[in-house]
Amino acid sequence: MGSVRPEPFDVKKVAVIGAGPCGLSAAKYLLAQQAFESVVVFEQNPEVGGVWYYSRQPSDNAQVPQVSPFYPPDPPVRSGDKPVFASPMYEVLHTNIPWTIMKYGDLDFPHDGLIFPSRADVQEYLVKYSQDVRHLVKFSTQVKSMTLRQEGLQDRWDIETENLLDGQQSKETFDAVVVANGHYATTHIPDVKNIKEFNAAHPGVITHSKSYRVPEDYAGKKVLVVGNAASGLDIASQISRHCKSPLLLSVHEPTPEENLAHVGAEEVPAIEEFLVEERGVRLSNGRVEKDLDAILYCTGYLFTFPFLETLTPGLVSDGRRVYGLYKHLFHIDHPTLVFPGLPIRVVPFPVSEAQAAVFARVWSNSLSLPPVEEMSRWEEDEAERRGKAFHVFPKLGDADLLDEFHEWATNSSSEKGKEPPVWDNVQKWQRGIYVEAKLKFELTGRKAKSLEELGFTYQPPSEVESEQDIV
């Protein structure tokens, strides 16, 4: 690949925003490169983990509707000695993917643990993974703003932070920045007819899954859940055992029959209009549901970067994608700025490692980027091909990304650095069957410690079968 600029990168100080899964892997790979004078990680919570750092108290700051990414960050849900920020996790949550492919390349989950770990298991795992980079983390420190300053051909980034324990403001300059703030902060609640008026008349009826914690809160209530992605189905399944029967599940596309049976809900079409007087909704087929006690939106989140709003051109418009990036990672005009963790429907931990391996090598000048024109052309082609689902990867798209980035990283001109993971045939097979395996895990009481216990056994390919056939 050609160089992005005639001058090499001059990166000595690196900032990492966020000590969640992507921020931790970034710190590890940057250290392993042995090319940077300092790596500093800013984390607003008092512990690592990002979304996995659970807050029992939910956020009550959701806007209804919420369709704009240009909204200030949530305040902490608990003030005092250690402010805590609301997590999108809920009390009883298990991963959607088995730990055997979810894990980082150099650390297994406990082999005697559940094959689909609980949220507490994952948080404990991340704390363990963080041990050799914790000294880099400035906890309870929130990034308030980040400004680009150019010195010749080199970019510099001025970052202003606030210590949330004593209110002290600080400003530091960095040569490169890893933006690993995650994308589960700003909720998405669509602007449906009369939703504002409904919310004003019936405050608290409309909520988002980010504020969901326990199903007992819905005991005896008439409930409508909106959305049938993984979290929507899981939450609906929990609530349906406590609320008035049947729980209503509003969807755009039908739920697979086996999954719907497990949820125990009645599937209905999309909401067309809110009915204020009836405390109800009119659905797209004309059906009316009245006297709703809870309408829970499981409709995802918007990409948002409140500390980077001065960067031009802007990174986001409607919050559905991030603009100006090469390979969903490098800012094309300012490649000392990277955004790991944007791909959706991928296994995030190993993907974040693959991304970190590449940008650590690029910034140390042992790996090059294509010319700006080529990177821009890639983004244009990708946008035309994927449309609105720009960051949404197809089935096994993460396996392809791991292969691509592993090959890219291992073409480095230096032997320094940490090698990113790739999946073998067994792991690719596990990636292919995880949806069916998770459903079986739920149906059998969330007790299984292996895929074999659930009836899934890998069969090695015969000589005439291709890897694709096996997957």
What are these regions (language model features)?
Residues 17, 172-184, 224-226, 291-300:
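Short hydrophobic core segments
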Residues 31-58, 248-255:
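Glycine-rich FAD pyrophosphate-binding loop
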Residues 110, 118-125, 133-135, 155, ...:
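Glycine-rich dinucleotide-binding loop and its adjacent helix/turn
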Residues 338-471:
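C-terminal, flexible cofactor-proximal segment of oxidoreductases
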